């Protein structure tokens, strides 16, 4: 049995987690602003990947990122004709979009656990909003951010439907771990080692994410 599919899934999940970390922190901070217009609507849109069937999510991503789309055309122009879909990049984006709601929710829990009096004290001492964000808010919310990244990584590692729609069954000739399990199962071959490896890895991520999340519920 080849472990290339697991390694490919690991690479995709790692890059997808980095993407969701950047966008997740920004979106979570935005949603914490109680005066944000249409805040509930934006929250609902961000959470949509949780309720959409993976194939439907993949279809929407194909429409947004495909050859006839503005984003797809811009990507091809930027990278000399390389498409975003049916490629490694498409797999990363599909995994990132699918896991983004989990990351945002965990980061928001972390932000809500930050004591407002500490923020007020920093402002009283003359710290500007940017300094407060990077020296007070984000460090205190770090366990929630880390928990979100772990959840997002576990979700990205096992993504199947959206990845299959956006990146195809093979990326440079290699399937992701989830697609490999399905292919081997349909071919009547043993998939237990790969399935067990992905399960152990995913459960470990969830275990540590849950431990970090409980810290916030006790602090909040």
Model feature map: region roles:
Residues 1-4, 163-211:
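Interhelical loop and adjacent transmembrane-helix boundary motif
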Residues 2-33, 44, 96, 149:
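Transmembrane alpha-helix signature in integral membrane proteins
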Residues 6, 31, 48, 121-123, ...:
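Short hydrophobic faces within alpha-helices
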Residues 14, 18-26, 52, 200-211:
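Generic alpha-helical transmembrane segments of integral inner-membrane proteins
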Residues 18, 104-107, 115, 129-160, ...:
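Transmembrane alpha-helices
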